[in-house]
Structures are given as structure tokens and as C-alpha cells.
Amino acid sequence: MDRLPRIPLADIIDRFVDWITMTFGGFFDGIANGLAAFVNGIVTGLGFIPSILLTIIFAALAWWISTRGIALFTLIGFLLIDYLGYWDPMLQTLALVLTSVIISIVVGVPIGIWASQKETVRRIVTPILDLMQTMPAFVYLLPAIFFFNIGVVPGVVASVIFAMPPTIRMTVLGIKQVPADLIEATEAFGSTTAQRLFKVQLPLATKTILAGINQSIMLALSMVVIAAMVGAPGLGSEVYSAVTQLKTGVGVEAGIAIVIVAITLDRITQNIKVKKKSRGNA
Amino acid sequence: MDRLPRIPLADIIDRFVDWITMTFGGFFDGIANGLAAFVNGIVTGLGFIPSILLTIIFAALAWWISTRGIALFTLIGFLLIDYLGYWDPMLQTLALVLTSVIISIVVGVPIGIWASQKETVRRIVTPILDLMQTMPAFVYLLPAIFFFNIGVVPGVVASVIFAMPPTIRMTVLGIKQVPADLIEATEAFGSTTAQRLFKVQLPLATKTILAGINQSIMLALSMVVIAAMVGAPGLGSEVYSAVTQLKTGVGVEAGIAIVIVAITLDRITQNIKVKKKSRGNA
Amino acid sequence: MSVDEKPIKIKVEKVSKIFGKQTKKAVQMLANGKTKKEILKATGSTVGVNQADFEVYDGEIFVIMGLSGSGKSTLVRMLNRLIEPTAGNIYIDGDMITNMSKDQLREVRRKKISMVFQKFALFPHRTILENTEYGLELQGVDKQERQQKALESLKLVGLEGFEHQYPDQLSGGMQQRVGLARALTNDPDILLMDEAFSALDPLIRKDMQDELLDLHDNVGKTIIFITHDLDEALRIGDRIVLMKDGNIVQIGTPEEILMNPSNEYVEKFVEDVDLSKVLTAGHIMKRAETVRIDKGPRVALTLMKNLGISSIYAVDKQKKLLGVIYASDAKKAAESDLSLQDILNTEFTTVPENTYLTEIFDVVSDANIPIAVVDEKQRMKGIVVRGALIGALAGNNEYINAEGTNEQTQDPSAQEVK
Amino acid sequence: MSVDEKPIKIKVEKVSKIFGKQTKKAVQMLANGKTKKEILKATGSTVGVNQADFEVYDGEIFVIMGLSGSGKSTLVRMLNRLIEPTAGNIYIDGDMITNMSKDQLREVRRKKISMVFQKFALFPHRTILENTEYGLELQGVDKQERQQKALESLKLVGLEGFEHQYPDQLSGGMQQRVGLARALTNDPDILLMDEAFSALDPLIRKDMQDELLDLHDNVGKTIIFITHDLDEALRIGDRIVLMKDGNIVQIGTPEEILMNPSNEYVEKFVEDVDLSKVLTAGHIMKRAETVRIDKGPRVALTLMKNLGISSIYAVDKQKKLLGVIYASDAKKAAESDLSLQDILNTEFTTVPENTYLTEIFDVVSDANIPIAVVDEKQRMKGIVVRGALIGALAGNNEYINAEGTNEQTQDPSAQEVK
């Protein structure tokens, strides 16, 4: 194969990245500051509340949203994290994950809705999503560093790129799965597109969209250690430094903390009691 | 929480790891050499065949096992990898992934069978699997390095730990899903446990087990870049070095190569035409 | 009321629907009388509805009837432009809806026309009340007023007290009443009903038809009812349109349709029995309940009691017909401990399987027990009951077995067993 | 053949099965006659089978009958120790199987006893032939010989030519024949059949029963047949065991069971109609097919033809009964363009809904058309047909509507509509 003139794909990409950094420099900095402020806002906000109180709040939240079992798990889990001394890094990881997930929802759901309404949009978006999910997450670090240099912001950006696809995919799926005869009924009674979307399509799609968000949370969590490579603080960087300094003990401890956060978030989002089906009286 | 005497969980783990390295040193070295030989054997073996010919062989294999569409994708994909100059690293990655998956099958399926027969075994194994899958893969690098120091072997070991759970889980599921009345029929006609397993349970579970193996392949592939951190050669290390040297172009190119390998392996294993249901005449 | 007094509610002028590309060219070909096949070959597009022309009077129940694929649901969906007509005009109360803007059309759908669907199309995530008020909700009517109106329609269809339930808690019949109530809440002039009762089980369907007629007497809406069931059309239609392959074949009152069927197709359609197939005993025989001769009188009695019959044929192990056991004899035998053999009555008439119905007509009418149908080895194949004979002759294919032998046709018959 | 000549195939001595903990203590309590409730309270374990004692003769069809939960499938599964008995002994051909080792037991299952299952339990990934030869395959019989044997059994059950198909390609009846063939291929002495025909539809079930009887005549196996259907037991059983709540209530031939039911329970069981409930016209009336008086004679004729009836009641819009239209009159009216009103026949008998069957018996028997059942406002509620009256009196609950009014009970009745 070497006979063929090799198109310098690598250089083209590099020059393209440099060009973007030049032209949109200011724009990216703006985003960077906004994002950093948002994440740190969460961290300091949560930081004010003493760990015990915060643990109880989390457990109560878990109880209200889902089941008693999960509330108990949350309580013990977070107590353990605090006990092992990983409370602050945990808060930073939580802030990083929540921010990435919130962005995935705010950006992802509308794209999903748009794709569900326009067939051509859907046909373009789906292969991109496939690519985004199979491409190793590391690769996303590169553009993140160039546009947002080191710190929590590139971590968030890389996490968002990696974690957003399921939210988009499930939003499209949820809306598409609404039976055709219901859509016809909305037409026959004279609904506008907005009325059809908000009164029928979205309510029926909620369950599937929530499943998508659950997947996004798990993906964001799986990125925390990789994000640490670009300076994102939290449990991820604890693991990363433990690996680089070959301190197995610390690595396992921080790993367990991540596992606790992961299982808690996963169980809560999976058991969100969807209010829709409350049985009316006879 | 700081008032409580902090149990030095980290130190306990470290001392435990050191103790294992001491006592089982020889044993681990044996495995290391065996594994290294196996992986390098694949690499040199495949290396002998010129890339064009190997690409055609892969494409033919894909056609035979699954569908024409996938064979075409394999052909073009591997040609592109060769064209971009990533042929050798690809071979190494393929060897790493195949080795990890083979180990996952050889070790995982028997454990799955054992767990499906004994309820207590299943009750112990399942939580461990959950833990293994939620723990960040990085953490597995630590024991891998200690026991097998640097190179492809720790990469394989870490990949196996991360990739094996789905194979075990799906083997148990596949066997458990065989309807109770069929099991009763095997009993009523006087089958031994082995006969029940190989004549009825495993054949009916094949489809689910294959789905488990497909998931293991994808997990192994997602580990290649992390494995590179402990010296495993291949596309993973291309990406890793690109990231550390901030060369986005190379990073994206190597990333694309990984995506091609991932999609090819995924489609092939998903479409393996299970021979079972060939329609008889009459 | 003679025809011309009643005002025209809906006017449909030469409306056609072509599915596929090159619809313009297809419409042209339709105009100069090309057949559907020619159009399909030339333009690759299929003709859904071919130049439909009719008027619907105000307050009338106008039934559009045809088999599946006849274009009836396409035609009805063009009335509220759920499906855009390819050619022709549609007027409602004189206003032409075919060139209305999106917004004007939405107003017509909200105020003038409501629709009831075959599979109910109720919103599973909304209670019955929220479903019923949906139409008014879209129009921004405030909550208090629209819920009050919705309750009224629910009362009208007899669903008071169910408003807080969810659709999946109700039976098919009740769900369709909600569909009806939802359509009525907008107080439209026109009700489009697309096979509204086809998904219900036969018994409920007849009740719903009666209810629709009562409702129509009270609220006096113009109803366009789509169905594939002749009985349903005859029972509720003031006038009926017959459609076949996209064409309107005939329009008229149920009497007119039956009186002079406008062409051979309509005749066959209402005739619905292909008299050319001559029926034999095998076609109408039912499964024979028999008792083995080696059983006792009490077993025979219990079998007869369970089947509500007063006589039963006795057979030996090879199912060879031996005679008849009457309930009265069996009772006596049970008291005085006789065996079935002692009370076997050997006068009975049998007919071979392929005798024509006409031949066995008199045998059946004067025999007081069902006639036994036997094969050449005198083995029991089935029995012929008087009701089945009359029903079959009257063309009711409920009584006719498909391939002329009773049900075990698809299993290899028992005779094969050595 | 008197009883004592035939050799005993299976002997069951005081066999019990207790589910739950403390089974030893429970067996003790059973021995000294404690009731099931006392045992449950004391040990928390339930008594599945309570000291069963019976013998099965060689070559006999021995039916074990009981409602669900009577312990019949537990009892049959103890014969091949699929379920381990808690106490008592079981002998097959005199060898005690209750204390056999795992391997000895496996030999008995491979050679002596085969089983046929209610839901067939065929291996979906194996062809019909591979399913049938499974038993011999386990015993290591070489491929050629076992396939030849399997083909023989398939021929025996009439499934020649289907050997290469897969189970999901066959109908229920044919799948059960494969189950039968698979059990026969091992050439066992004993066939355990656990509700083998209950999953089949009624028509096929009767054929399979006949086939089993033929098969039994040819191959002469000892068959233990489990069922909950009295008719099935009467038709195929040489002897029947009646079980209730784990106890054997009676053992005897079908005649003996019917002749002197051993206790009140058995009597009620075979009686199966609770005569205490006195039936009224409402209980047995069927849905009334009516025609509205404003329709024409041809519509009436078509409705009658479709329903295979020769007369139909005419009602007004409020479903008030006006009279009867006979098919012959309607034919004349159609020819000479008369309306239904002209040919309305006003002699007809009506009965209110709650008249007792005994009172309307003579009215029904001498009227030549079905009797109309009306409510206080003379509105049609249903019709009483002679067949239904006889069937109901004979205790066949097929003819009795659940709550004494016909089917629309669960929908709020139409009357509510204003």
C-alpha cells in the first residue's frame, strides 16, 4: 500500500484544529469561564453543607425519588466515602458528572426532538452518534485541551462528547415509538406541532428518555479517570495519580468511591417513579 | 468523620499486594511468559501474511460467518487502516483483544456453567461481576503491573478482568432461561447432569452466550488505550502517545482505525448465523 | 322527507387520490378513462380513490362500505384532509376545504369535524376525562368549562363515574364510548367513524350500533360511517355507498341497494354465497359424540347430560356404528343393571359422506334424531343436524366446513393409525 | 377378567409428600390422623399427598382424576421420583424404587417408565426425529438403530414424513403425538401421562383420546393418565382414582364411580350442577336479533338469511316490541313492494325476564318460534330457544348466563342513554 501517495490526513486535521483555535479562541474562553464557574459553583455550594447533613439529604432524595433500599445504600455508601477521606474529591467528581449530564440533556434532548421530527436530520445524526460512541474517549481529550487547555473544563467537554449520544438516541427512539394512530388522532383534533409534541409525544417518551439519561450518567462516570489526564480534579485524578505512582491501595480506595457514586446514581435514575400512571379512583 | 480512627484500608491493600507478589512471583512469571508468547505468536503469524491477502481473508471470513454487507465493510476498513499506515499496530491490537477474549471465554464460560448449576455459587459471583464492571478499568492496571510488570501481558490481564463479566453473566442467563419443563423432560428420560448440559442446556443457551462474548469484545477494545499506559503496543499506544504529545491528527487517525476494528468485530459476532434452525424438508 | 328538501352538508366533486410519483400524469390518465393497471404500468403509482362524486345530506347517517383495500378509509381521511386529495374538490357547508390554509383547516378540524378510530386511539397517559376534553384543550378553552362539557358527553355515552380511570382499565366497548365522547365534546357538525365497531366482539358491536342510532336521534349529527360488514351497513345506514378498488359502485338506501343491485359485482357482493359449489353431507356434518358399547349405561347418561342431547350413537372399538342409545332406555338400564348392549336400538338411518344435501333433505326433516354419516366400513364420520342443513341451504357459511369434511382435516386423519 | 387374575404392575403403599420444613414431624402428625390445617399450623408445611394406597394392574389404563391442587401431578411424579416421596414405598414389578440409588433410578427411568407432558416439553433446537430418539440416545444406542426405532414410533402415531421438521412448525395435536412417540421409543412398560391432552383444543382432544385407546389396544402398555376432565376419565379409564386435597377419595371403574358415589363430595363432583340455584328466563335468554320497523322487507330478509332463521321480531326506535316478521311474508312483500308494517304479525307470546323455567316450559315447547323476553316497558331483552331450555334443565351450564342476564352485563346497559 505504501506506493500510493499517502494523504497526510493527520496534518490536515492538525491544521484544521489550529485554525479553529485561532478564529474561535475568544468564544471558547467564554465557554471555559462559564463552565468552570458553574462546576466550581456546585463544588463550593455543596462544600458548605457538612458531609453528614449532605449524606442525609442525598439519602432522603433517593428515598423520595425511588425506593427505600437505594436510600439506605446511598446513606452507607456516602458515609464510607467520607470515612475513607474522599469527600471533597467526591464532590468534585459529582459536580463534573452532573455538569456533563446537564449539558447532555440541555443539548441532547432538543437535538433528539429535532431528529425525531425531520427524517433527514435523523439520517445524518445516527451515524455520527455511532462513531462518537465507538471512538476511544481519549481522542476527545485532544480537541478539549486545545480549545479549553488544562483543568475541569476540558474534562467536562470530553465527558459531554462521550456521554451525550445515548440521551439523543433514546429521545429519538422514545418519540418514534409513539403509535401512529395516536399521532393521527392528534392531527384529526387539530393539534399544532408543539401541542402534539408536549401533550402527547414527550409525555409518552419520558420513560425511554430517562433510560438514555441513565446511560449518559454511567458513561460520564466512566470518563472521570480519563478526564483527570487533562487536569479535571476529583476521584478520577486520585485514581490516575495512584496509577502513575503505583499506589495500588489508594487506587482501589478511590475506585471503590467511584463505584459507590456510580451504583447510587444508576439505581436512582432507573427507579424514578414516573408519576404518569397514578391510578385514579374507580 | 475524622474523629474516628481511620482504618488504613489503602495500606492493608498495598501490603496484601506485596505479599502476593512475593509468594506467587514464579507463578505469575510463568503465566507472563506464556501469555507474551501467545500474543506475539499471533502477531508474528499474522505478520507473515501480506496485508492485502490478510484483508481478503478477513473479508471472506466475515462473509462466511455473517452477511455480505459486513464483508464489504471489513474489506474497505482494513484497506484504509493499511493505507493510513497503521497495519502493524492494528495486528498487535487484534492480538491483544483476541487473546483477552479467548481467555474470557475459556475461563468465563465454565464459571458461568458452574454458577448456573449451583445457586450459592451464583449468589457469590453476581455481586463480584457488578463490582468488576463498575470499577474504573484503570484500577486493574495496578495489580497487573505489580504481578506482570510492563508490556503486553499486564495489558491483557487488565483487559480480561474488565472484559470477562458479560461472558460469565450471559452464560448463567442463557442456561437459566431454558424452560423448566424441558429440564423436567431430561430428568424423566434419565439424563446425567453432563447429558442435560451438553444436549439441551448449552445448545439452547448459545445465542445468549454469543451476545455475552460480543459485549466482552467491545469492552476489551475500549481498554486498548488504557492498556497502552502499561506498555501494551498497538493502536492503543498510538492514541496514548498522540494524546501525551498533543498531536490531534495522529490521535484521530489511530482512533478511526480502532473504530473500524470495533465495528467489524461487533457486526461479525452479532450476525453469526446460528446453525440450529436450518429448516428440514417436508 | 323527499331528497331535495334536506340541505347538503358535504359535497365531493371528482375527488381522486393517487399514491406514488407522477401523480399529475396519473390524474390525466384517469380523466381519459385509463384503467388502474395501465396507470400502474405507465406511472408506477396506484390509484387509491378514483374520481369520487357524492353529496351527504345534513343529519344523515351516510355509510361507506367496501372490502379492505377498496379505498374507503382513504376517502374518509380526505374529508378532513388527513390525506391530501390529488385532484377534485370537497365542500363542507359550501366552503371549499381542498384549498384551505393549514390554519383554516385546523379550525375546521377543531370545530366542524371530529373522528372516531377503529382501534380507539385513546392517549394511554391521560385519564378518561383528560382524553375527552383533549379537543377543547387544544382550542384553549379554560379547564373548568371544558371539563364540564367533557363530563356531559361522558354521561351521554353512559360512562359517568369512570372519568378518573385510565384507558387500559376499560373493556373494548367502553374504550370506544370514550372515543365517541371525545369526538362529541367539540360539538362538531360531522362525525367521521372509521370502522369504529370492527375491533369489538360481535355481541358488543350490535349494542354499540343500537346506541349510535339512539345518539343520532338525540344529537342529530351528520355521521359518515365506514365499515366492511354488510349487516352493520343495513342496520344503521340511511344511505349506503358501495366501493370496490377505489371506485364508487353504487349509492342508495339499503332497500335500493338490495332491490336492484346496479351490476353483477354488487349482486355477488350481497349474495355472499357461491351457489356454484354444490354441498354434500360431508360439508355440513358435525363432530359425532359417541359412546363405546363396552361402557355402562350411567356413563352414557352422563355423556348425554353433559352434551344436552337425548340420544347418542354407540360404536365398537374400531368406531364401527352399532346403534342408538336413548336417554330414557339408559335410565331404565341403570336402574335394572342392564348393559348398553341390551338397550341398543338398531333402527337408525345412515348416509354416506358425499350424498348431496338436496337428496338427504327429506331424510333429515322427518327423522327425530341427527342422521349418522358413515364411510364405506360403516365407521362413524359425523352427524347432520336439521339446523345446519337449513342454515347451509340458506347460504350461511357458518354451517359449511371448509374442505367438505369436519374439522380434523389439517391433522393426518386417525384412520392412518394401524 | 376378574380383578385378581391380572399381575400387579405398580404398588403404592402409604405414600405421602409434605412440602416445607419439619417434614418428619408432619408425617408423624399425619400418621395419627391430624388434619392438614393442624399440620400447617404446627409445622408450617403443607401436605401435598396424604398416605396414598393403591395398586395398578399390568396393561391397565389407570386414570388419576382431581381438580387442580388435588395432588394428582405430585402423586404421578413420585412414581418416577421426579418428586421424592416423604414417606411410604413404591414398588414397580415388585422392586422397591423408593430406596434405589441415583444410578438404579436412572436405569428405571430409561427402561421402565416414560412420561408425556401437558405442554409437550419438546426440545425446540432438535428436529422431530432427534426429539423422538432422545431417550435411546441417552442410553448410548448407536445412531442407526435408534433412528430406525424412532421412525417406527413416529409411524405408530401417524407422523411419518414429518421427522425433519422442527416442533414449532407443527400444530398442538401433532406436537403431542411427538411427545407420545418419544415416550414409546424407549419401549417402556409404564407410560405416565400428565394431563397430556388438556392443552389441546376440545375437538382434537377427543381424537387423541380415541387414538390413545387404539394405541393401547395395539401396544398394551400400562398407562397412568392424569386429568381434571370427568368426560376424559369416563371415556378412556379402565379404573379411576378420585383425588381431593391430597387424599384419595374413591377408586373404581367408571360405572362404580357413577353408581354409588362413595361420599357426598364425589356425588357433588359428578353432579356438577348446583341445582339449588333456580333458573329464570333471564338466565337462558339469548341475544335477540331484531329489525327496525322503518326498514324494508329486503333488509329483513337478508338479516334472516345471514342468521339462518325463518322469523325475526320487529321493534321501533326505542326497541319496543311490535310484532313478528315471517320470511315467507317478507318475500311476498318484497315482490309487491309492501312495507314491513303491512306484513307485521301481532300474535306472539312474551314472558317477563324473571319467570321461572318451570313456568315457561309448556309455553316454549308448543310455540313454533323463539319466545320473546321483554321488560316492563315491552322492550325486547332477549329470546328463549327450545334447545337452551332443555340444555339448562339438563344441568349443562354452557346454556346458563352468569348473572342471570345476557352478555352486556359488564358494560353499563344501554338503557342509561337518555
Curated annotation (Swiss-Prot), chains A, B:
The chain crosses the membrane at residues 19-39, 45-65, 70-90, 94-114, 138-158, 216-236, 243-263. Its main location: membrane. PROSITE patterns: ABC_TM1 (PS50928). Residues 1-18, 66-69, 115-137, 237-242 are extracellular. The keyword Transferase does not apply. It is found in: Cell membrane. Residues 40-44, 91-93, 159-215, 264-282 are cytoplasmic. GO terms for cellular component: ATP-binding cassette (ABC) transporter complex. It comes from the Bacteria. The keyword Transmembrane helix applies. Keywords: Amino-acid transport, Cell membrane, Membrane, Transmembrane, Transmembrane helix, Transport. It is a multi-pass membrane protein. InterPro entries: MetI-like, MetI-like_sf. Residues 90-269 form the ABC transmembrane type-1 domain. The complex is composed of two ATP-binding proteins (OpuAA), two transmembrane proteins (OpuAB) and a solute-binding protein (OpuAC). Belongs to the binding-protein-dependent transport system permease family. CysTW subfamily. Involved in a multicomponent binding-protein-dependent transport system for glycine betaine; probably responsible for the translocation of the substrate across the membrane. This is Glycine betaine transport system permease protein OpuAB. It comes from Bacillus subtilis (strain 168). The gene is opuAB.
UniProtKB/Swiss-Prot annotation, chains C, D:
ATP binds at G66, L67, S68, G69, S70, G71, K72, S73. Residues 34-270 form the ABC transporter domain. Keywords: Amino-acid transport, ATP-binding, CBS domain, Nucleotide-binding, Repeat, Translocase, Transport. Transmembrane segments: none annotated. One of its GO terms (biological process) is glycine betaine transport. GO terms for molecular function: ABC-type quaternary ammonium compound transporting activity; ATP binding; ATP hydrolysis activity. It comes from the Bacteria. GO terms for cellular component: membrane. It catalyses: a quaternary ammonium(out) + ATP + H2O = a quaternary ammonium(in) + ADP + phosphate + H(+). The complex is composed of two ATP-binding proteins (OpuAA), two transmembrane proteins (OpuAB) and a solute-binding protein (OpuAC). Involved in a multicomponent binding-protein-dependent transport system for glycine betaine. Probably responsible for energy coupling to the transport system. NCBIfam families: proV (TIGR01186). This is Glycine betaine transport ATP-binding protein OpuAA. It comes from Bacillus subtilis (strain 168). The lineage of its organism: Bacteria, Bacillati, Bacillota, Bacilli, Bacillales.
